[in-house]
């Protein structure tokens, strides 16, 4: 498949950049578009070479804008539209089945399945058709092999023994091509052959009103040259024995996993510039999230084993009553790393001495199988609680004898354990350049960031000498990565850590059900029932180092006030009580429980709960008289604290996760589905041409009607929780609650679902941020400033209370319809024609409306709040599913 749309890229370049790429012309662009004076002699030779680089077609690699109309470019969001090769997707599949009868009592079957589906995109290294330049084609090589062998033996007339073994290999590796290497332009990356990912931002100084002047090229994401290869081996054995009224089943299973992560991002640097003039003059944007080269071991080889066994007895207590009972044992072995490249944080080991400002124990532990750094008393997985459990299961089915077998009552109860620890839960939160599923492979101490400095240049962004290996000879040297208070006050970035809480227990769920089925007719049955589920010890990302509230009565690490921002008075003076500005903001880094670790450090913690209750009604009509019918209706409610498996906590204060207990993100109150097939009767019964035309027709369809999904309102601009994270909250999705006095109903624009702009479904004025007043929750009281005035800090805010998934998106409906025609040509050959009408009435199903607002458009240490907030709140921007789509097919059956 070829997709020309994904082969396009909208690019932002300075509006007055021309084909004259002389230093004088480029300096003029800096002056005209940015108001910055650049001497032509100041232009860096690397930047000049990139701007003068031409493609094989004679066009410039960094293109000349196709319009100089500021208004048009602002409307489009770009001033150059590039057309590259089409994006391609290829899928190849093959399968083989083999059955062999060893004897009358022994049967062996084998299956093999192969699948490979590579994709290419000329601009996907920067996330699709947005901002990339040609030459850096992104390829995702994905595929799998699956093998299974099943052996079934009839040991005796009442004993059956079955054994299974299987193997699955999966791969998904992304790579980015490059038209040139760093050496060609004189960029010193210590021998790396990979061109760096380059980002040229627009910091707001552009004279143009074009919203985003960002230009990116090269492998600018952590997914540009990384992937995984997974091998899974499985085996099981089951024995069934029928003895009188008892049907006894026993068995066991075993599973072994090899997850190998290959990450080449320790060879790919990231370079970022504030704007085009900074790019010209080689002024790199500093900070780990901007200009960085990761140094160390970035491959991982994870291993895990699972095992289980069960025994179950299905007892025929009476002719109309069956009861099944039995326990199951599950052991979900935790992940380990083949070479011990696995670290964790143990809060009980950490120790900080406040009087001397010394971290005497950094709290990091390393897997025992690490020969150089293994921590005594720590296992290969670093987890401490048991990762196994015993799960009882009970079921019953009863048919009242007086009803002639027309009605059956069924019920069941069971516990089910599940793995809580996954590879993605080792990664830290966003914001420091090594987030995402592969972030753990770039996380200290086995990999450390090499940062650009004020003396860095485009030619030598990280100095002239290769960096030394990471300080992993012993944990004492690793402590150099974790700053004390003095270092934090001077601006040193704290260590961002992500991990799976070593104290976690194994998650499990308790399921129960009760239903009644009535066979009204031979081909018609009705079912009504109730089912429920309660999840325990579910995992959710919790920041273990969220700052505490410091007050004069309750100091924290010597701090007596709490502030995330550093607002100024009219003359630019700051409060004498707010003179610290740490990396995260204000004095946040000094109020944390563990000095030296980032407030955004996260543990995946197995403390969450969930509940699900549902009334289910169904009708099933087997095919008779040409009609087949299946219908179901579910009235349910799912509640939890955390619905997704992403890197962010969705709720209010993450240290009080129960405050975010609400409807699940995927909750659907009402769901109705109807599937049908009607075969038209035979009109003629002879073998004439007319008979072949008239007979064999059928109609089928699927109808789905369901409630919309829940949603709430977010603000990521630092307007919620600034007292903890300033504007640098990289771990939570901060919820904005209602203005006091407003209700869920009053916040909704009745009769306006949000699909007809400019009228939104929600009233922006109904929402407010939880601002704090001077003297409240540790905020300094009004007082003197550095310029002698009296000033008040009124810009601090806390987390909201409630508000998660308070609203619900539009109701959704979809009707699909098909016409079928089957014509027999001979006894063995037939033609089957289908005409499928997906969404036949072309009814739009609207997605949830936009729920992201901005109360702080400044997004900096001196916020500028606006009420009501900015953003397209309550306006629907997407639909779910496709418009009406018609397809026809013709099959030959033989």
Show where each model-derived region lies.
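Extracellular loop and loop/strand-boundary signature of outer-membrane beta-barrel proteins
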Residues: 80-84, 132-137, 146, 150, ...
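Gram-negative outer-membrane beta-barrel proteins
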Residues: 116-122, 169-177, 245, 256-264, ...
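Flexible, surface-exposed loop regions and adjacent strand-edge segments
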Residues: 124-134, 178-199, 230, 255, ...
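Short, solvent-exposed micro-motifs at the edges of structured domains
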Residues: 137, 143, 320, 334, ...
């Amino acid at each position: 498949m070829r997709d020309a749309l994904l082969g396009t890229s909208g690019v932002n370049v300075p509006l007055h950049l021309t084909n004259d790429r002389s230093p004088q012309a480029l300096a003029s662009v800096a002056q005209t578009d940015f108001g910055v004076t650049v001497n032509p002699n100041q232009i860096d030779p690397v930047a000049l070479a990139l701007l003068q680089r031409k493609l094989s077609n004679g066009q410039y690699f960094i293109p000349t804008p196709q319009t100089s109309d500021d208004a048009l470019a602002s409307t489009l969001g770009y001033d150059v539209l590039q057309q590259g090769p089409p994006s391609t997707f290829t899928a190849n599949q093959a399968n083989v089945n083999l059955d062999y009868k060893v004897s009358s009592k022994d049967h062996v079957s084998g299956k093999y399945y192969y699948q490979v589906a590579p994709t290419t995109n000329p601009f996907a290294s920067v996330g699709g058709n947005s901002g990339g330049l040609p030459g850096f084609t992104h390829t995702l090589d994905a595929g799998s092999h699956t093998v299974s062998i099943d052996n079934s033996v009839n040991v005796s007339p009442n004993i059956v023994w079955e054994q299974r073994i299987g193997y699955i290999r999966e791969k998904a590796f992304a790579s980015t091509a490059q038209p040139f290497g760093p050496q060609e332009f004189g960029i010193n990356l210590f021998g790396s052959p990979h061109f760096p990912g380059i980002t040229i931002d627009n910091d707001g100084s552009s004279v143009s009103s074009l919203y985003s002047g960002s230009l990116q090229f090269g492998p600018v994401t952590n997914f540009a040259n990384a992937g995984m290869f997974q091998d899974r081996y499985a085996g099981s054995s089951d024995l069934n024995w029928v003895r009188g009224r008892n049907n006894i089943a026993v068995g066991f299973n075993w599973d072994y996993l090899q997850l190998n992560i290959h990450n080449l991002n320790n060879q790919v640097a990231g370079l970022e510039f504030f704007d085009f003039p900074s790019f010209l003059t080689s002024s790199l944007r500093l900070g780990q999230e901007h200009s960085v080269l990761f140094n160390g071991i970035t491959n991982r080889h994870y291993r895990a084993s699972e095992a289980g066994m069960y025994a179950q007895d299905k007892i025929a207590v009476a002719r109309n009553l069956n009861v099944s009972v039995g326990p199951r044992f599950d052991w979900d072995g935790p992940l380990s790393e083949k070479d011990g490249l696995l670290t964790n944080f143990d809060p009980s080991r950490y120790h900080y001495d406040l009087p001397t400002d010394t971290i005497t124990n950094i709290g990091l532990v390393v897997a025992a199988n690490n020969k150089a750094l293994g921590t005594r008393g720590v296992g290969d997985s670093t987890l401490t609680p048991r990762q196994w459990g015993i799960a009882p299961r009970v079921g019953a089915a009863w048919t009242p004898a007086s009803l002639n077998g027309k009605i059956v009552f069924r019920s069941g109860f069971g516990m089910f354990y599940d793995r809580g620890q996954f590879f993605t839960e080792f990664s830290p939160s966003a914001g420091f350049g090594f987030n995402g599923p592969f972030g753990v492979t770039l996380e200290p101490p086995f990999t450390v960031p090499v940062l650009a400095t004020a003396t860095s240049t485009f030619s030598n962004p990280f100095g002239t000498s290769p960096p030394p290996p990471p300080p992993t000879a012993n944990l004492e040297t690793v402590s150099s990565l974790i700053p004390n208070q003095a270092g934090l006050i001077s601006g040193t970035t704290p260590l961002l850590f992500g991990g799976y809480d070593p104290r976690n227990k194994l998650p499990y769920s308790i399921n129960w059900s009760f239903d009644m089925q009535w066979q009204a007719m031979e081909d018609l049955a009705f079912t009504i029932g109730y089912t429920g589920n309660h999840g325990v010890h579910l995992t959710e990302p919790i920041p273990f180092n969220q700052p505490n509230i410091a007050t004069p009565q309750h100091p924290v690490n010597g701090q007596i006030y709490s502030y995330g921002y550093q607002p100024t008075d009219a003359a630019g003076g700051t409060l004498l009580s707010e003179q610290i500005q740490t990396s995260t903001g204000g004095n946040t880094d000094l109020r944390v429980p563990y000095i030296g670790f980032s407030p955004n450090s996260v543990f995946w913690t197995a403390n969450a709960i969930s509940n699900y209750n549902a009334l289910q009604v169904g009708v099933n009509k087997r095919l008779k008289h040409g009609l087949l019918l299946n219908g179901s209706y579910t009235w349910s409610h799912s509640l939890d604290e955390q619905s997704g498996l992403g890197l962010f906590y969705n709720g209010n204060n993450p240290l009080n996760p129960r405050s975010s207990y609400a409807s699940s993100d995927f909750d659907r109150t009402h769901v109705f589905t109807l599937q049908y097939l009607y075969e038209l009767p035979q009109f003629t019964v002879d073998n004439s041409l007319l008979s072949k035309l008239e007979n064999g027709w059928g109609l089928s369809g699927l109808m789905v009607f369901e409630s919309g999904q829940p949603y709430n309102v977010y603000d990521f601009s630092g307007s919620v929780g600034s007292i903890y994270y300033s504007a640098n909250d990289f771990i939570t999705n901060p919820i904005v609650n209602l203005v006091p006095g407003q209700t869920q109903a009053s916040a909704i624009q009745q009769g306006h679902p949000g699909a007809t702009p400019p009228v939104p479904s929600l009233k922006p004025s109904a929402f407010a941020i939880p601002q704090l007043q001077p003297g409240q929750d540790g905020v300094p009281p009004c007082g003197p400033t550095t310029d002698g005035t009296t000033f008040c800090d009124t810009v601090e805010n806390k987390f909201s209370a409630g508000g998660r998934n308070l609203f619900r998106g539009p109701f959704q409906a979809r009707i699909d319809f098909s016409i079928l025609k089957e014509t027999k040509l001979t006894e063995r050959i037939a033609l089957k024609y289908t005409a499928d009408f997906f969404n036949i009435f072309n009814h739009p199903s609207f997605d949830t409306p936009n729920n992201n607002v901005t109360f702080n458009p400044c997004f900096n240490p001196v916020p500028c709040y606006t009420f009501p907030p900015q953003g397209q709140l309550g306006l629907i921007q997407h639909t779910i599913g496709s418009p009406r789509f018609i397809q026809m097919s013709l099959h030959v059956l033989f």
